[in-house]
């Protein structure tokens, strides 16, 4: 029985964080490096404002991605996986919309047709990895299948399944969510390289690459499959 939800929620989050650190000791180090990159962007764009409708639209999308990036990291450590997948789905749509804007402007087309429409994750607007994730995340967001409810299921003593209102660490699901989070981060970084090159005079990616290279080297030691390609 739950008597004080707030206290038990904090306790469950702490248990999750301890379990992640035990199984993957350098996860916090990886998240810290990702946060360092985000802070680098925040400081770099602190006094920048768009010079037109298109730039302002892009900057708003980028800021939205940054804010959710930091929140997702916290949810993953807490094993709050439904919340993670909903936010990660939103992040994929942001990357797709940024790609759509670039295609429209490069072809000298109006952005008017994009307004009021859900970003298209097809048509090469996101990587295949993100496109595949999006389908799964949409099933969770729309509650169109029952399988995703396993993210908050728990086995009870009488061999039945219940659903917990408290987050619980699962070595498969929590780490899969972390891998998706890192994949999304890399796709965002790739976009930001080209965006900053076009937006910031005399931009150099040296500081960016130092953080990313450190992340990759640390990641290769982490046993996380998302780093297997490096």
Predicted regions: what is each one?
Residues 1-49, 110-230:
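Long, charged low-complexity segments
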Residues 32-72:
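Short, contiguous, well-structured surface segments enriched in hydrophobic/aromatic residues
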Residues 61-103:
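Short, hydrophobic, well-ordered secondary-structure elements
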Residues 98-114:
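Long, amphipathic alpha-helical coiled-coil/dimerization segments that form elongated scaffolds
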């Amino acid at each position: 029985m739950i008597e004080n939800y707030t206290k038990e929620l904090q306790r469950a989050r702490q248990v999750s964080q301890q379990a992640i650190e035990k199984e993957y000791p350098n996860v916090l180090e990886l998240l810290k490096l990702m946060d360092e990159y985000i802070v680098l962007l925040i400081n770099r764009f602190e006094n920048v404002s768009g010079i037109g409708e298109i730039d302002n639209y892009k900057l708003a999308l980028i800021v939205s991605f940054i804010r959710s990036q930091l929140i997702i990291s916290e949810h993953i450590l807490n094993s709050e996986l439904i919340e993670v997948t909903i936010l990660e789905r939103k992040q994929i749509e942001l990357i797709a919309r940024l790609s759509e804007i670039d295609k429209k402007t490069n072809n000298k087309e109006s952005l008017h047709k994009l307004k009021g429409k859900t970003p298209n994750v097809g048509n090469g607007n996101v990587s295949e990895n993100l496109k595949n994730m999006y389908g799964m995340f949409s099933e969770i967001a729309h509650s169109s299948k029952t399988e995703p409810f396993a993210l908050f299921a728990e086995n009870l003593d009488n061999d039945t399944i219940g659903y917990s209102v408290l987050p619980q660490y699962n070595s498969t699901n929590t780490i899969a969510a972390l891998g998706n989070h890192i994949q999304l981060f890399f796709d965002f970084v790739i976009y930001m390289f080209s965006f900053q090159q076009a937006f910031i005079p005399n931009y150099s990616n040296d500081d960016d690459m130092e953080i990313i290279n450190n992340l990759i080297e640390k990641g290769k030691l982490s046993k996380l499959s998302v780093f297997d390609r490096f």
